[in-house]
Amino acid sequence: MFSKYVLATLLALFAQSMCIQELSLPPEGSHSTAATRSKKAKTAISEDIMYNYLMQFDYLPKSDLETGALRTEDQLKEAIRSLQSFGNITVTGEIDSATARLIQKPRCGVGDRRSADSFSPDNLYHEIGSNVRVRRFALQGPKWSRTDLTWSMVNRSMPDASKVERMVQTALDVWANHSKLTFREVYSDQADIQILFARRAHGDGYKFDGPGQVLAHAFYPGEGRGGDAHFDADETWNFDGESDDSHGTNFLNVALHELGHSLGLAHSAIPDAVMFPWYQNNEVAGNLPDDDRYGIQQLYGTKEKTWGPYKPQTTTTTTTTTTMRAMIYRADKPAYWPWNNPSNNPNNDRNRARERQEEERRRQEKERRRQEEERRHQEEERRRQVEERQRQEEERWRQEQERQEEENRRRKIEHKSQWERNPSKERNRPRERQEMERRRQEQERQEQERQEQEDRRRERERDRQLEWERRNRNGAREPVTPTANTTPRPTNKPYPTVHRQHHHHNKPRKPKPDSCMTYYDAISIIRGELFIFRGPYLWRIGTSGLYNGYPTEIRRHWSALPENLTKVDAVYENKQRQIVFFIGREYYVFNSVMLAPGFPKPLASLGLPPTLTHIDASFVWGHNNRTYMTSGTLYWRIDDYTGQVELDYPRDMSIWSGVGYNIDAAFQYLDGKTYFFKNLGYWEFNDDRMKVAHARAKLSARRWMQCARSANEVDDEQRWTASLVSEGEETGRSGSRELRINHFILSILLLAIANWRS
């Protein structure tokens, strides 16, 4: 009995010791079977993830994708060591926790292997005999053959496009400030560097993986897609330059890194470098770390001269040997020799003054960029407000159209129901239709006659006004005496809108218009000077006033215009500094005074209606710097890059409140304000309120021709007040006459009633 109890106790103690052995950590060098199985299972899972990561970023060749399981363990460990060395973590060759954290960090999508080969221990920073450090940055592939590069943004319709453009320009400025590179934004698909936001597979063979890990990738300099930078649109980006990652990944830091690839730099193993492949939210503040600065200067040179060591050169003569030193220029990090730097000479203040001037210039440049950025923000806000107002106006117009259509449908239904209730009228329907058509034609004829009479009345009124202005200006010195062969006065539209090449050898020249008594066909700022067009003549006004010898014929400046030119409809200078003339159904484009090849062209080539006979005015609106054209009651906006009318035009001129229809001319003056002209007056336009600044037109001759007021001329306000007074007096006189007549009639009625009663 006792032996059985002892045996059971020993078995229990043995089982307990085995459990304790299983739960305890194995000693160093031990190989527990269970622990080995667990480690191998974990390593198999980690190796699968690690294989994909190492192949994606060039630590293992991509050609072995299908035979990856046949690699040796030594190859995998060597690749892991390269990754750990490049990532600046402890090199173990094992998939430890630090390595797992490293491969989970967001990073650039460009591979590391090609640049990792350059980072062997004997190529790191170390001191050599000449006390010069060897560069650690990596150069990859070709570089750009020139230093003036262009860039453009593909996704211009994305919500934060303006912020992206600003950040990209800031990143490019950082690279430009430390090299001889210059960057210019263009609106073309042929730019050297194209910025693209895309998702997943986007056609270049390097698809994105959604939010996290791969943030972007870029291509090294070259043709085609060379230099292009692509960013993952699924990422949460912070376009405000904030250092707090809670609002998203700092786009400025990522763009600075990717554009380094676009310029020819590969990845760097220095953690503080911009070209470190893993994302880190470091504040650059306009300065590059030394590693990146040496790399970009090795490729494209530096803006300023650096001081390096003297290289000894020996010159031998017949009697003595003299050692001479020459200064050489080094593109990488130079050695510093205080006695060779003239800025350390206390007697030399010129270098210090130059440094102060350079520092002041940089400060002013920074302030200028800040002001430019602020102005751009304000311009965007103003443009947004204008577009919102236009959208509301379009919505109101659309609702009005729908209401009218609904009203027309309702009337048709009521009319149809009336015919259905009274079938006997069906027989008279053709006759009524004919009668309605006859009435419509009669109304059109009467309306046309009324319009012609109104036009003739306006022409006579304008002629009388011009004659009155001439008499008040000249007084009794130049009396107007009509003769039998007097040339008829010009009418409101004295010149045809369609110009043809006819040769009138005996055609008399038109008299020069009076500068102070005429209206304007067109007006524009050309090369910073004011040009006013009337008939075949023009005035040219500079900073000192009207040039001598003007007005002169337009064809003396632009001889390629039609020989029988009688007037121009509109003129403006476009953003390419070309001068555009609109004459009838055609338009001409001049490079200075030379006609551009292929011109003239019809107005329809701009996307305008083929039935349009002329343009009233063309101008660049200072509010949004866009080009507009008007004709009659409509206006259009032109896309300056495609040269075509934008899709949602034309629109009604009533949007320009107070301007009215059928204007004569319009332009943007040097003060940035827009002015509209009609007859002898003009209006200044208030861009913020979208209406004219003054309801009554001001005389054009006083403002633009500096014409003085004559002694006999009556002020506009006095004339307006006098007209009101005269109307009031006339009303009072007519009222008193009516009162006397009424009293007389009342007396007669009373007498008649008295006689009838008697």
From Swiss-Prot:
Gene, per the UniProt record: Mmp2
PROSITE patterns: HEMOPEXIN_2 (PS51642), ZINC_PROTEASE (PS00142)
The entry's keywords: Calcium, Cell membrane, Cleavage on pair of basic residues, Disulfide bond, Hydrolase, Membrane, Metal-binding, Metalloprotease, Protease, Repeat, Signal, Transmembrane, Transmembrane helix, Zinc, Zymogen
Protein name per Swiss-Prot or TrEMBL: Matrix metalloproteinase-2
Role this protein plays: Has metalloproteinase activity. Proteolytically cleaves the PGRP-LC receptor; involved in gut-fat body innate immunological communication (GFIC)-mediated activation of the imd/Relish signal transduction pathway. Required for larval tissue histolysis during metamorphosis and is involved in pupal head eversion and fusion of the wing imaginal tissue. Required for growth of the dorsal air sac primordium and development of the dorsal air sacs. Promotes embryonic motor axon fasciculation. Cleaves and activates frac to promote motor axon bundling during outgrowth.
Binding site for Zn(2+): H257, H261, H267
GO MF annotations, alphabetized: endopeptidase activity; metalloendopeptidase activity; zinc ion binding
Spans annotated as Disordered: 335-514
Lineage summary: Eukaryota, Metazoa, Ecdysozoa, Arthropoda, Hexapoda
Biased composition (Low complexity): 338-348, 479-494
Ranges for the Hemopexin repeats: 513-561, 565-610, 612-659, 660-707
One Pfam family from the record: Hemopexin
GO terms of biological process kind: activation of innate immune response; adult fat body development; basement membrane disassembly; basement membrane organization; cardioblast migration to the midline involved in heart rudiment formation; cell-cell junction organization; collagen catabolic process; embryonic heart tube formation
Active site (record annotation): E258
Expression induction or repression: In fat body cells induced by sorbitol and galactitol produced by hemocytes in the hemolymph, probably in response to Gram-negative bacterial infection.
Root EC class: hydrolase
A Gene Ontology term for the protein's cellular component: external side of plasma membrane
InterPro entries per record: Hemopexin-like_dom, Hemopexin-like_dom_sf, Hemopexin-like_repeat, M10A_MMP, MetalloPept_cat_dom_sf, Pept_M10_metallopeptidase, Pept_M10A, Peptidase_Metallo
